[in-house]
Regions:
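Conserved N-terminal substructure of TIR/SEFIR domains
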Residues: 1-73, 89, 101-103, 145, ...
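Short amphipathic alpha-helical segments
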Residues: 23-25, 78-82, 121-123
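Conserved TIR/SEFIR loop-to-helix hotspot centered on a Trp-containing motif
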Residues: 51, 72-105, 115-117
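Glycine-rich, charge-decorated loop segments at or immediately adjacent to ligand/cofactor-binding or catalytic sites
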Residues: 116-127
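C-terminal helix of von Willebrand factor
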Residues: 139-158
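Long, low-complexity intrinsically disordered regions enriched in small/polar
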Residues: 164-204
Length: 204
């Protein structure tokens, strides 16, 4: 089980019926920036055999910031009865946000390729303060720079957030290319390589 001295700083609040791939990308990139133990993502962070409901609410309490990740289906997702999940008092997304408010956590709405911020009149009364919180948008065509911008802002806002400037993916490496021309060596910029890379003479 997780120790009392948890490293969790960022809690990802998201709806599984919404943009699951988007939130997985967000977790991957923020984990690369700050370390995987720093970011709580339920499908990654809850240990086998753990009480998953207690684990989620404990993680909200331990975190410094709760990112409310909103895709295009976040607000309109419905349950088996055809009612909006966000209106259900037992909805976990709703309960996590309300707990974050109750505990005075920094709550940051993150829009995944959603052009407009959520409106107060579209939210249940208990969550309407989400509409006045400063949010950040992650665009489909600008996801990389947008997530980098989010990470930079989080680093400014959250005390003690670990800094990890380089990607940690085992499948990514860097090399520096040199060219020899007339005895002169020219050094080029670093390049990230995914998969196998062979450096050597070319034979036909």
């Amino acid at each position: 089980m997780r120790k009392a001295s948890s490293l969790i700083k960022i809690f990802l609040n998201y709806r599984t019926a919404d943009d699951r791939f988007g939130v997985a990308l967000l977790d991957r990139e923020l984990s690369r920036a700050f370390g995987p133990e720093t970011v709580f993502f339920a499908s990654k962070s809850i240990e086998l055999g753990a009480d998953w409901e207690k684990s989620m609410f404990d993680a909200v309490a331990e975190s410094e910031a709760v990112l409310v990740v909103m895709g295009r289906r976040w607000l309109g997702a419905v349950n088996e009865a055809g009612l909006r999940r966000i209106d259900d008092p037992q909805d976990f997304v709703r309960r996590e946000i309300l707990l974050a408010f109750e505990l005075g956590k920094r709550v940051i709405p993150v829009r995944l390729d959603v052009p407009e911020r959520v409106r107060a009149e579209d939210l249940p009364e208990a969550l309407r303060s989400l509409s006045v919180l400063q949010d950040i948008a992650i665009g489909f065509r600008s996801a990389g720079p947008d997530i980098d911008r989010l990470a930079a802002r989080l680093r400014e806002l959250i005390p003690g957030l670990p800094a990890r400037s380089a990607p940690t993916s085992a499948s990514a490496g860097k090399f520096t290319a040199h060219a020899h021309e007339g005895g002169v060596v020219s050094q080029y910029d670093q390049v990230t390589v995914h998969g196998d890379f062979h450096a050597g003479p070319r034979f036909s």
